[in-house]
C-alpha cells in the first residue's frame, strides 16, 4: 500500500520543420515585375509626391514606396498619378510596353523548425491510483526570404529620357522581401487513472491553455541600376515588427472502461474543449 513507484522523464523533440529552396529563371518578352508594380500604383491611385515623401513608410504601403524611391517605377507625362516601370518604354502613340527581352529570376528560401521540451512525472499509489503530469515548453523559429531579379539583355532597348535632358538605359533591378518569426509557448497536462477493481477503470485529464508568445519582423528593399550610375537607387524599408500572444483553449478528457473478462473491453470517452476561447492578445 502507499506510494509504490515514481517515474521521471524528459523529452526533447523536433515536431515540425521548414526547409525550402526554390529557384526559377527565364527570358520574358512580354511582362516585367516593375511594369506590374507601376500598373498597381496607378490603379490604386497613388501619387509620386506621396510615394517620394521621406515619411511615406509611415502611412503608405511599403512595396510601392520601395519601388518608387529605389527607381523601379516613376511618374511620366507630367502626371503625378501615372506610373511607368524602369523596364518599360513610352512610344510616340502613348503605348507603354517593355522595351525588349528581360532576364528574370526568382528565388525563395525558407528555414525553421518547431521544438518541444517536455518534463513528465508519474506515480503509482497502491496499484489503485496512477497520477501523471507533463510540463511542456515549445519554441519555433521561421525565416522566409525571397528575391526577384530582372535585367536587360540589351540595355539599349530600354532608353530613358530624363526631364533635365539626360539619357540613360536600364540595366537591372533586385527586389527582396524578408520575414522572420520566433515564438515560445508553455502548457501543463495532468491526469489520473483509478482502478477500483471488478474490471472497471476511470480516467480524467486536463490540459491547461497553451500560451504562445510570438514575435514577427519583416523588411523589403529595392535596388535599380542604370548605365548612368549617378541614377542608381537603393531603398530599404524600415524593419516592421509585431509581438502578440496566442492562447489556445483549456481541454479536459474523461474516460470509463470495463473489461468483459477475456471477451473484450467496453469504453466511453468524453472530451471538452471550447475553441471559442482561443484568442490573440
Model-derived features with residue positions:
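Outer-membrane beta-barrel porins/channels
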Residues: 2-281
Amino acid at each position: 500500500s502507499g506510494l509504490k513507484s515514481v517515474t521521471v522523464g524528459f523529452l526533447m523533440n523536433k515536431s515540425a520543420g521548414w526547409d525550402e529552396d526554390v529557384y526559377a529563371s527565364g527570358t520574358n518578352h512580354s511582362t516585367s515585375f516593375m511594369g506590374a508594380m507601376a500598373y498597381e500604383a496607378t490603379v490604386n491611385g497613388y501619387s509620386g509626391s506621396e510615394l517620394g515623401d521621406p515619411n511615406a513608410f509611415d502611412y503608405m504601403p511599403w512595396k510601392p514606396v520601395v519601388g518608387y524611391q529605389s527607381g523601379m517605377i516613376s511618374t511620366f507625362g507630367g502626371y503625378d498619378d501615372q506610373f511607368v516601370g524602369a523596364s518599360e518604354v513610352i512610344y510616340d502613340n502613348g503605348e507603354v510596353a517593355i522595351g525588349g527581352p528581360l532576364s528574370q529570376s526568382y528565388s525563395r528560401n525558407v528555414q525553421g523548425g518547431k521544438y518541444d521540451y517536455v518534463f513528465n512525472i508519474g506515480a503509482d499509489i497502491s496499484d489503485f491510483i496512477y497520477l501523471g503530469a507533463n510540463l511542456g515548453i515549445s519554441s519555433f523559429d521561421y525565416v522566409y526570404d525571397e528575391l526577384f531579379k530582372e535585367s536587360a539583355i540589351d540595355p539599349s532597348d530600354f532608353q530613358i529620357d530624363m526631364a533635365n535632358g539626360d539619357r540613360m538605359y536600364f540595366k537591372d533591378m533586385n527586389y527582396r522581401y524578408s520575414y522572420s518569426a520566433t515564438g515560445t509557448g508553455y502548457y501543463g497536462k495532468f491526469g489520473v487513472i483509478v482502478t477500483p477493481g471488478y474490471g472497471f477503470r476511470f480516467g480524467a485529464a486536463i490540459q491547461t491553455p497553451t500560451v504562445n508568445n510570438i514575435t514577427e519582423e519583416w523588411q523589403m528593399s529595392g535596388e535599380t541600376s542604370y548605365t548612368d550610375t549617378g541614377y542608381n537607387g537603393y531603398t530599404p524599408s524600415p524593419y516592421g515588427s509585431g509581438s502578440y500572444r496566442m492562447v489556445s483553449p483549456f481541454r479536459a478528457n474523461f474516460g470509463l472502461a470495463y473489461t468483459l473478462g477475456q471477451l473484450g473491453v467496453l469504453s466511453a470517452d468524453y472530451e471538452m474543449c471550447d475553441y471559442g476561447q482561443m484568442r490573440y492578445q
